[in-house]
Amino acid sequence: MPTISKEEIERALDAWAEHLLLTPVVQSGAPLAVVGIVSHGDVLARRLVNRLEKAGCQALYGAIDITLYRDDLDLRGSRPAQRSSHLPFSTDDLYLVLTDDVLSTGRTARAALEVLWEYGRPAKVEFHCLVDRGGRQLPIQPDYAAFNLTVTPEQSVRVRLHEIDGAEDITF
């Protein structure tokens, strides 16, 4: 099973933060928020905000739970555990970077956008992910993907992050 190492993930996060720092919106000094989708996307968002702040760029951090906005709740049989969102600011007029670990069908990103509208009207929203594995079912594409993998629908992509999983790698 192919693996992307912790070191490769760290280098990818450095490049991701550098990409954000070089965007015209950030260069202009516009207010920036990095919001992660619980549970791995919020860890990535926190890491990105830390990198941005070390580079002198102020960025708000937030996390959203999309559980109640999923379009497959009726298909799952049991109700999945809901976690809390942490978005202690209005998103009005912000440049908002929505982050997640893996982009596949696009359904999670769609649900996340729906949650965001409840917190205000951002000036701009971009979707960034650690891994784009393809397999879209909705017309959603990432504005930035650290890794683009070519996998079949049957193959799984597993992201482990130290803060949640106690280990760090991507296997596929």
Residue locations for each model-derived region?
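PRPP-associated nucleotide enzymes
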Residues: 1-172
